Amino acid sequence: MNLKRKWDVYSRLTRIDRPIGTLLLLWPCLMALMLAAGGMPDLKVLVIFIIGVVIMRACGCIINDYADRDLDSFVERTRSRPLASGEISTKEALILFVILGLSAFGLVLLLNGLVVKLSVVGIILTIIYPFTKRITNMPQMFLGIVWSWSIPMAYAAQTGEVPMEAWWLFAANWCWTVAYDTMYAMVDRDDDLKVGIKSTAILFGKYDRQIIGLFQLAALACFIAAGWSADRGLLYGLGILTFVGFSTYQQMLIFDRERAPCFKAFLNNNWAGLALFVGLGADYLI
């Protein structure tokens, strides 16, 4: 395999070619750093967390594809993934996972002891998540914990502690993650039923849109609580209102439960997260 071909395989394995997951991880992480710092976070901490988010998202994709390698070939959206298609060996994928994981851990060692301890838990959660799809109908709820774990880590890095304010943001992001990843699971629902992969899209059944809406409302309430506990003002409120607008649009997209619109609704959450981040940043700057 030549270098260009290997890069193509690695970029698809780690989803470098599809940054949506990285962005969905990044917005709440940056919000946590800003809230913890009361504005602009420490530059060293900021750089470490941005790089760490990119690396850990890649790690999560690798271990997810490793866990699903025997099933992905039966799912329309995933059958061309490198492990499922045999373009890369499981050994090579696991070696890359270890290298990236150690790189992320090396970055964390530049921070305080509490962050290091939390990072160990985060790595364990990342490894466990893909296998929850085999044993529970609620893997999205476990994913919500994994994808929110950078929030207490960000507070710990910036302040040396994890106050109640952090857990409001954690709860908001957990609810939001369950909502948008259920939209994502709606895309694969028919294939997942055939191969035995479990998801909240299957669990919620005909009430999927309504329950997603409840999680969106819960996320909204917790985002408001996080802002209130940090004394945020009008511009953050405008970010919240924009988030509501995007959430409403997503409900319209998933109304008929068709694959393409459901995937579009999932992707639209990037803009919802960006709106919250920009609103919070503007509230501190202006």
UniProtKB/Swiss-Prot annotation:
The keyword Thylakoid does not apply. It is a multi-pass membrane protein. Its EC number is 2.5.1.39. Its cofactor is Mg(2+). It catalyses: all-trans-octaprenyl diphosphate + 4-hydroxybenzoate = 4-hydroxy-3-(all-trans-octaprenyl)benzoate + diphosphate. The keyword Transcription does not apply. GO terms for molecular function: 4-hydroxybenzoate polyprenyltransferase activity. It holds the Pfam family UbiA. CDD domains: PT_UbiA_COQ2. Catalyzes the prenylation of para-hydroxybenzoate (PHB) with an all-trans polyprenyl group. Mediates the second step in the final reaction sequence of ubiquinone-8 (UQ-8) biosynthesis, which is the condensation of the polyisoprenoid side chain with PHB, generating the first membrane-bound Q intermediate 3-octaprenyl-4-hydroxybenzoate. This is 4-hydroxybenzoate octaprenyltransferase. It comes from Shewanella baltica (strain OS155 / ATCC BAA-1091).
